[in-house]
């Protein structure tokens, strides 16, 4: 008698191997930090363990289109002092990727105009490596929360706080962390009363002295920042900052050493890395975009601090992580003043993650390699539910 139609014994049937978790690496975006985000994505795609994870690279163009892109990390590096662009990597100039709209179904769909949408399969976790507005500021995180898709890094509130330097400093102050003097010029102030806005800054300089740093309130990677030595350069600095954000922040220059510390979420809670020191770049007025990414000004890892100073900056970095309700990872930036006091400058909820970035270097020196860092972040996201937590 033929047995081909008889029920199989489940214990004797060949079992389908478990599906590997699928990670969508989302990068690019509409902010001024588009190119650095692409470089970061290239580093993550090169480091992620393909034996453990399936990977889906999704780039967001400068005009906001979600595109399927080539999985070719070697094309995502800085070349000839130029950062790459999602449009150069996109598989189509018109097609778009659609996220799930039902939390019970995590299937991602690709759609071309005039064609039947194509299912790309389920995504288990999103690794967003976007920097700046429309990606690092809580907007993307809110979209993923609505879709019910787990994601790497800070949630909606922490991302928003970490992006807006004014509210970040307010949160730190309320939790007892020391911040430097600053002033804020909101869009309406500059647009309706420029003389009043200028007077506000001049009065601030009169109290705290020149030079000042004028910067976008909601941007990173040192983009749009100008060091202003006197009143003559003020208007130009304001307009440069406003090219990136209509709201600007003015900070007093602090004399001291620039110290950074990484925070990473482990199973038992956040831990701090060994700190790093950013020496004054010889060819730049301060640690600007060119020094960070183009000329690769090297940091000192670990920072030459005393044991007591190291322990204190690590404590403060974790305190900043907790104050902003962060998750996943943070880089906390401090000044160690001439009075031997740590003043927190800012946190980055998605810090620079390129091979030359300080965050991976600090964790490498702490015993966590770049591939392990990527793996820990993905695993933390897989453990964490979306929604209120």
UniProtKB/Swiss-Prot annotation:
Keywords: ATP-binding, Cell shape, Cell wall biogenesis/degradation, Cytoplasm, Ligase, Magnesium, Manganese, Metal-binding, Nucleotide-binding, Peptidoglycan synthesis. InterPro entries: ATP-grasp, ATP_grasp_subdomain_1, D-Ala_lig_Van_CS, D_ala_D_ala, Dala_Dala_lig_C, Dala_Dala_lig_N, PreATP-grasp_dom_sf. Residues 1-12 have a biased composition (Polar residues). It is found in: Cytoplasm. Its main location: cytoplasm. Its cofactor is Mg(2+); Mn(2+). Residues 1-22 are annotated as: Disordered. The keyword Cytoplasm applies. NCBIfam families: D_ala_D_alaTIGR, PRK01966.1-4. Cell wall formation. This is D-alanine--D-alanine ligase. It comes from Streptomyces coelicolor (strain ATCC BAA-471 / A3(2) / M145).
